[in-house]
Swiss-Prot record:
Source species taxonomy: Eukaryota, Fungi, Dikarya, Ascomycota, Saccharomycotina
Gene from which this protein is expressed: FAR11
Name recorded for this polypeptide: Factor arrest protein 11
Source species of the chain: Saccharomyces cerevisiae (strain ATCC 204508 / S288c) (Baker's yeast)
Function: Participates in the control of the reentry into the cell cycle following pheromone treatment.
Annotated Acidic residues bias: 141-160
Pfam families: DUF3402, N1221
Claim: Cell cycle is one of the keywords in the record: yes
């Protein structure tokens, strides 16, 4: 008993309340009942035990949303609080411990009434008592702050209960409550009968389904290659207008050869006939060339099946290999006539088609049999190199830009150029072998030897070194093969590679300055931050990040202790110098060691560093010594001890260097023509198979389908040429690659690529899964018509589920876009705003070869986008983590210095172009003269003086 004669008792501050008595938004108009005093609770039935347990859990879950605080559940007149809440720990207040918080409850003389009731006087009096309790205020401030934060975060869901739930106050008011068929209270919003009927029908239809439909991402089993099968590649050379010449070639073959069946059966006789036809080309060019074209196409009139036809094609073209130079000379002569002459163009263009057909078939056979018959392949490669066929075709296509003619057959020339590049340089498998050999030649580790090992780029490692130096100035991190630090502040090359450490990030610079002075020997740690916001207004944002721009002056965890149990348990294998007084935290030292061991220096990076040093030497007016250039493959001789793979790799590099030197001035026109050819696909029309069921309608659409097919094949060849050149140029020298990438970018490739991707984005999935009509004509079908047995055995399977003919074109386009915009912020800014939507459409079909360029561009584009864009493209962002190899310290989503990247973007582009001009003029001065660059020895040749002469000044 206390002084007032009232007894005290301990009881829980919050008691469970029945769910039907709860009211929204904690504004109560009626009296509530506690759950333990409801009749159903006092006398529980067996069937309702589980329901009551669920209600108790639900009460606890709804406490925060419905403001079930202590103020809402104080007792009535006989239960008034006059005590103070004891000091509780943080865990107890958070509900992490099982202690029950209790207060003293004053009991009134009216103890006989067992029902708790809320009255307005009791609530007001209780609130007045709370104003005098300081401990209660502290708890309530914290609760209010938490509730305010939740309301700010969930503002859009503030009135969910008012929309979805029944007004619980109506129960206590005794008003009419809707009851469903089962006799239960219906808390749903009232609806009219028609709407309820439609809802019932939808529910019934859902119940009838055995399982809900689930949209799976369909996968396409396809791999990007520069050369697929011989059947596919040979058929892509022809169009419907070319088939009319087949009969003439067969007739001339029978006229030239007295025993055609023996030619088909006896290989020795066939070789002698081929030799006679080659020798007679100067006397009768047209007839001999058409007969050789029929031989190259496999003598299809004498074959009985497609497999036999393919076998004869391989045999006959290998017989033409020893005479390849004569065929190339005849082809060049005819091509020049089609380009320059004005007479007999119809005849000349037919001869150009047949001569180029022979070369195309020989190239395809050699690409396919590179591993099986290397001797014949090397003969063809050497013959093409001696005759400069690759350079001739490039300049031939360049001439078409200024003097376009139908007789030049530009579509066939583009396809032939693509096959020549693949043959002379190599396909994907040859590229991997060559890259491995070149890396070994320069003493570098090929990246694919350890694909599971994460690495870090030199630029990110340099940024990490600067961060460690800013925190621990006396600690010297290992350089790990990085170039020496030189003053580049006055050089234009400073914009090429800019490390961006966290200490110089604007977010870090905005952090507060450390509270203690940096000169303090051993300052105490800062006080713990206040978790409670006591002021009015919204809770301010607080950041507890460390300012990386200030040195760390606190003692290390392993400083001054000889016996460290952690180091004893971990085998570090670190040699410590006894006289070294610099001690840093163990985690920092371990991170420095891991990153230094994982540093990956690519061949392209070393090449860029070398040319950058030469560029800086020239800027300062120093003399250069270019006697032994490490990356000049033209002057590199074969070593007697070199392996076969290394010799082959050096030969490929020399062919690339020769091609680059000869065609440097032609790349601009080549890219222009190729992009113009690619843009022709923007006018294509597509027809679904379900719309073209009539055979007569299909025959009417066949000419249009042939045109669409020819445009798409030209798109594939044009994109393949650019992709192959970029790929091989980068392996030869990074600045060769950058020069071609600049030319492609300046030709507005980004707009062209985005337009083509947008054109095909809607039909892409259905096109891949063969839902659209394709032309029924093909090279093999046309050849089968010349032999009855062949025609009977030949069958076209048009019911295939997947048609991947168009996928290489998209893969090439995306890869070129990635190579042109990669690590170039200025070019990323030119990407259209809808590029993310296009990527999502091509992301619908699962295929890693299509995913990789999309995800790599997404990885570079994401930091520059806002939160809404990131949320809308979260599927692409997740794909980067799933399918792409990331670096050790790669915080690519939000860790970039956006303002710094954007401000330095233009400078990076200018510095790169200046370095490209220096590289080309330094190594390919003769080729640069065709572009207007050269030494000016006399002042009279100065550009300003020449302009003055033109103006008569």
């Amino acid at each position: 008993m206390n002084a007032s004669g009232r007894s005290h008792s301990k009881g829980p501050i919050i008691r469970s309340v029945s769910l039907e008595d709860l009211k929204r938004n904690s504004s109560f108009k009626g009296n509530l009942k506690y759950k333990d005093e409801v009749t159903s609770h006092k006398e529980p039935q067996v069937g309702t035990l589980s329901n009551e347990e669920l209600l108790k859990d639900l009460d606890n879950m709804l406490r925060g949303k419905l403001n079930m605080g202590r103020n809402s559940f104080h007792a009535d007149k006989r239960n008034k609080s006059d005590g103070n809440i004891s000091a509780l720990t943080f865990k107890a207040r958070s509900g992490l411990e099982g202690d029950i918080r209790t207060i003293d409850i004053q009991q009134d003389s009216s103890d006989e009434n067992d029902n708790f009731k809320f009255s307005d006087d009791g609530v007001n009096k209780d609130r007045n008592n709370e104003k005098d309790n300081n401990t209660d205020n502290a708890v309530e401030f914290q609760d209010d702050a938490e509730e305010a934060e939740e309301e700010n975060e969930d503002e859009s869901f503030a009135n969910v209960d008012e929309l979805d739930g029944f007004d619980l106050n109506k129960v206590s008011d005794g008003k009419h409550v809707p009851i469903n068929e089962k006799g239960e209270v219906d808390y749903n919003m009232p609806v009219d009968k028609e709407f309820q009927k439609s809802l019932d029908q939808c529910a019934a239809s859902l119940e009838e389904r055995s399982s809900a439909p689930y949209a799976l991402q369909r996968a396409v089993d396809w791999e990007l290659k520069m050369f697929y099968s011989l059947e596919d590649e040979l058929s892509e050379w022809f169009c419907s207008s070319d088939y009319m010449h087949f009969g003439q070639t067969q007739t001339l073959f029978k006229q030239k050869i007295t025993q055609p069946q023996l030619f088909f059966d006896d290989e020795n006789y066939a070789a002698s006939v081929v030799e006679c036809l080659i020798e007679d080309i100067p006397n009768s060019l047209a007839s001999n060339l058409l007969a050789l074209s029929y031989i190259s196409m496999g003598c299809f009139a004498f074959t009985n099946s497609k497999s036999e036809h393919t076998k004869i094609i391989r045999r006959n073209n290998l017989m033409l290999v020893p005479h390849i130079q004569e065929i190339v000379h005849a082809f060049k002569k005819i091509a020049i006539s089609c380009r320059d002459d004005n007479r007999n163009l119809k005849k000349q263009t037919i001869l150009l088609f047949h001569s180029s057909t022979i070369l195309y078939f020989i190239c395809s056979i050699c690409i396919e049999g590179r591993g099986e018959n290397p001797e014949a392949v090397n003969v063809v490669i050497d013959a093409f190199e001696k005759t400069d066929l690759l350079e001739f075709l490039t300049k031939y296509i360049e001439n078409w830009r200024w003097n376009s003619r139908l007789a030049m057959r530009i579509r066939n020339m583009i396809s032939l150029l693509f096959k020549l590049i693949v043959l002379q340089f190599g396909d994907s498998s040859v590229y991997k072998q060559t890259k491995s050999s070149i890396y070994n030649l320069h003493g570098l580790t090929y990246p694919s030897k350890h694909p599971e090992k994460l690495s870090i780029s030199p630029l990110h490692y340099q940024a990490f070194r600067e961060d460690i130096t800013s925190r621990f100035p006396d600690y010297n991190m290992p350089s790990s093969g990085l170039p020496k630090d030189v003053d580049k502040s006055e050089s234009l090359s400073q914009f090429l590679e800019i490390p961006r450490p966290k200490s110089k990030n604007p977010l870090n610079m905005a952090l507060i300055v450390p509270e203690k002075h940096i000169a303090t020997p051993a300052p105490s740690p800062p006080s713990s931050p206040q978790l409670m916001h006591l002021g009015e207004g919204p809770r301010p944002r607080k950041s507890f990040q460390t300012n990386m721009a200030y040195p760390c002056l606190y003692p290390s965890d392993n400083e001054g202790s000889e016996d460290d149990t952690l180091e004893d348990r971990i085998d570090l294998n670190i040699e410590r110098k006894p006289d070294n007084d610099i001690v840093i935290p163990f985690s920092t030292e371990e991170a420095a060691r891991i990153l230094s061991e994982s540093l990956e220096i690519k061949l392209s990076t070393k090449q860029l560093w070398y040319e950058r040093d030469l560029f800086m030497i020239t800027e300062r007016g120093w003399k250069q010594q270019l006697e032994n250039e490490p990356y000049d493959y033209a002057a590199l001789n074969h070593d007697a001890n070199s392996s076969k793979e290394e010799k082959s790799a050096i030969c490929i590099m020399q062919r690339i260097d020769k091609y680059y030197k000869s065609c440097l001035s032609s790349f601009n026109s080549l890219v222009f023509v190729l992009l113009q050819t690619m843009e022709s696909s923007l006018t294509n029309n597509f027809h679904r198979k379900s719309e073209v069921s009539d055979k007569n309608l299909l025959n009417m659409l066949t000419p249009q389908l042939e045109i669409v097919r020819a445009k798409e094949l030209s798109l594939k060849s044009a994109a393949g040429i650019l992709h192959a050149l970029l790929k091989w140029f980068k392996l030869s020298h990074i600045l060769k690659f950058e020069h071609l990438a600049v030319v492609i970018h300046d030709s507005r490739y980004i707009n062209t690529c985005a337009s083509i991707l947008s054109k095909y984005s809607e039909v892409y999935p259905e096109r891949v899964f063969n839902k659209y009509v394709q032309t029924p004509n093909s090279f093999w079908k046309e050849c089968s018509l010349s032999n009855e047995s062949y025609r009977e055995s030949y069958s076209v399977d048009d019911s295939g589920e997947v048609d991947t003919e168009i996928m290489p074109s998209f893969a090439y386009l995306l890869r070129i876009l990635r190579k042109v915009t990669g690590n170039k912020t200025q070019r990323l800014k030119e990407l259209p705003l809808s590029i993310g939507i296009l990527f999502k459409r091509y992301y619908r079909l699962f295929n890693l070869d299509m995913y990789h360029p999309i995800l790599k561009i997404t990885r570079e584009l994401t930091p520059f986008k806002n939160k809404r864009w990131k949320s809308e493209h979260m599927e692409l962002i997740s794909g980067v983590y799933l399918y792409e190899k990331l670096e050790l310290t790669d915080n690519w989503v939000t860790g970039k210095d956006i303002s710094g990247e954007l401000s330095d973007a233009c400078g990076q582009e200018i510095a790169l172009r200046a370095l490209l001009q220096f590289y080309n003029f330094q190594h390919y001065e003769i080729s640069m003269e065709d572009l207007g660059y050269g030494h000016r020895n006399s002042s009279s040749q100065d550009l300003l003086n020449k302009e003055s002469e033109y103006l008569n000044i």
